[in-house]
Amino acid sequence: MGNTKALIVGISKYFLSGANDLLFCKNDAIAIRTAFIHGLAVAPENIITCGLTDIVTIDDFMTSLRDFEKITQDDDTLLFYFSGHGTTIDSNHYLVLSDKLISTQEIIAYLDAIPAKNKVVFLDCCLAGNFQVGGSAILDVESTASNF
């Protein structure tokens, strides 16, 4: 039986024009790490936390993502949590890092290529529903709400 592994990203400080600093994303990352450890019994050594200095550059993020991939086994469950700015440009969703945008679709594709049994993505950012995951059902919110 596999283990649960987590990559947690919390970005509070931004250098990009139009991206205001967010006061509590680092706190979100710390709180979700605690929740994963105590609520889901994720071993602390199986958690990579990126953003404890408030800043996550593209280099920091990609290094953490590659490290996350290296610790993953085929039967593991992966948890990816992001707290920070999100934006949409030309109908494409991006996560806003401290120094650069990164396509949410690219991150999903990267995570999808990691051979793990289960993958869960948590996006705590604006416009977080504006991307697609292959093989997932399209949700009709109004129909679901009326049937509820």
PLM region descriptions:
Residues F24-A29, R33, T87-F148:
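Cysteine protease catalytic core and zymogen-processing segment of caspase-like enzymes
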Residues M1-Y94:
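Boundary/activation segment at the start of structured domains
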